Amino acid sequence: MTLRCLEPSGNGAEGTQSQWGTSGSAEEPSPEAARLAKALRELSHTGWYWGSMTVNEAKEKLKEAPEGTFLIRDSSHSDYLLTISVKTSAGPTNLRIEYQDGKFRLDSIICVKSKLKQFDSVVHLIDYYVQMCKDKRTGPEAPRNGTVHLYLTKPLYTSAPPLQHLCRLTINKCTGTIWGLPLPTRLKDYLEEYKFQV
């Protein structure tokens, strides 16, 4: 199931306006709606979710950024919730994020879709591709045969992230075993809320 863009609401991150939502009972959300709400709540904590933004606004934000800089915004296409806008060697470009059957993946042509990795959250999807780009990239490459390489390296934040969040990112980059650290339980709970490196 691909969710469609609904009416605007003011529930975006850091004062941004979001346009996505889910249908269903207001009393008891379905497991699907609860899963989606959790994933979108997680996204709102990143600092690089911009909410409602046009293609041209995204291009303007990324125009002077280095290659690999990206942001997440609400999709302007009614069949998708979100879009990655990223600066490539050919300039800013956009890639839709598909949500289907409780999973997120990059939009692609049909013959490739089944091979693309799927994730429970948008942040996990982005974290995976950022780590993959770190592992594979050694430096800028010139595009061959008209192809443009897509690298996700650095998020473009809506504003300076809180120091707490930056510390959490650093800890996540250094260890995968939060519960083994000599820290108070409350702090470990905070670290567990966001287990990603980006």
Curated annotation (Swiss-Prot):
Ubiquitinated; mediated by AREL1 and leading to its subsequent proteasomal degradation. Ubiquitination is dependent on its phosphorylation at Ser-52, by PKC. Ubiquitination is stimulated by LPS. It is found in: Cytoplasm. GO terms for molecular function: cytokine receptor binding; growth hormone receptor binding; insulin-like growth factor receptor binding; phosphorylation-dependent protein binding; ubiquitin-like ligase-substrate adaptor activity. There is a cross-link at K173 (Glycyl lysine isopeptide (Lys-Gly) (interchain with G-Cter in ubiquitin)). GO terms for biological process: cell surface receptor signaling pathway via JAK-STAT; cytokine-mediated signaling pathway; growth hormone receptor signaling pathway; intracellular signal transduction; lactation; mammary gland alveolus development; negative regulation of growth hormone receptor signaling pathway; negative regulation of multicellular organism growth. Residues 151-197 form the SOCS box domain. Coiled coil: none annotated. GO terms for cellular component: Cul5-RING ubiquitin ligase complex; cytoplasm. The modification Phosphoserine is found at S30, S52. InterPro entries: SH2, SH2_dom_sf, SOCS2_SH2, SOCS2_SOCS_box, SOCS_box, SOCS_box-like_dom_sf. Residues 1-31 are annotated as: Disordered. Residues 14-25 have a biased composition (Polar residues). Transmembrane segments: none annotated. Residues 48-156 form the SH2 domain. Residues 1-75 are annotated as: Interaction with AREL1. Pathway: Protein modification; protein ubiquitination. Its main location: cytoplasm. Keywords: Cytoplasm, Growth regulation, Isopeptide bond, Phosphoprotein, SH2 domain, Signal transduction inhibitor, Ubl conjugation, Ubl conjugation pathway. CDD domains: SH2_SOCS2, SOCS_SOCS2. The SOCS box domain mediates the interaction with the Elongin BC complex, an adapter module in different E3 ubiquitin ligase complexes. Substrate-recognition component of a cullin-5-RING E3 ubiquitin-protein ligase complex (ECS complex, also named CRL5 complex), which mediates the ubiquitination and subsequent proteasomal degradation of target proteins, such as EPOR and GHR. Specifically recognizes and binds phosphorylated proteins via its SH2 domain, promoting their ubiquitination. The ECS(SOCS2) complex acts as a key regulator of growth hormone receptor (GHR) levels by mediating ubiquitination and degradation of GHR, following GHR phosphorylation by JAK2. Substrate-recognition component of the ECS(SOCS2) complex, composed of SOCS2, CUL5, ELOB, ELOC and RNF7/RBX2. Interacts with IGF1R. Interacts with DCUN1D1. This is Suppressor of cytokine signaling 2. It comes from Sus scrofa (Pig). The lineage of its organism: Eukaryota, Metazoa, Chordata, Craniata, Vertebrata.
